[in-house]
């Protein structure tokens, strides 16, 4: 299996196993109130290290790529303490992802798993919706012959 796909599948498994999460889905942005709190994992983007091309490496040579999936935490009805509830689930997700040995193994010795930040709807003039995007970066060596 492709490493990108394996990483994304593992992220959904991790999200589904978190205490307090009713549902974990992939690439779905419509999740009913009854299935929340939930985490939706979005595949998002991937970029190759451009330095390899500048060094004259052929296109089939191994290359480090960075994928940037997003975990969208969705709460149910607006809780009175939406900020603390989102932060609690963010902390659980970040800890679970950064300490997961399977993800570390998938990234490999030359790769890495990194928390890249979060974004919310909480702010002056915003919707105050109970959702938070949690961003990760996974770097791994792409070996075309292993795809």
Q: Model segments located where?
A:
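Two-metal-ion RNase H-like nuclease active-site motif
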Residues: 41
């Amino acid at each position: 299996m492709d490493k990108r796909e394996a990483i994304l599948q593992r992220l959904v498994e991790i999200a589904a196993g978190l205490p307090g999460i009713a549902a974990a889905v992939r690439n779905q942005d419509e999740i009913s109130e009854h299935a929340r709190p939930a985490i939706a994992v979005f595949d998002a983007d991937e970029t190759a290290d451009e330095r390899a091309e500048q060094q004259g490496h052929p296109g089939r040579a191994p290359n480090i790529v960075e994928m940037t999936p997003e975990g969208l935490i969705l709460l149910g009805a607006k809780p009175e303490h939406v900020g603390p509830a989102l932060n609690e689930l963010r902390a659980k997700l970040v800890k679970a992802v950064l300490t997961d040995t399977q993800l570390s193994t998938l990234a490999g010795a030359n790769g890495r798993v990194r928390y890249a930040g979060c974004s919310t709807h909480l702010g002056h003039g915003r919707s105050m919706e109970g959702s938070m995007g949690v961003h990760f970066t996974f770097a791994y060596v792409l070996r075309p012959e292993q795809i």
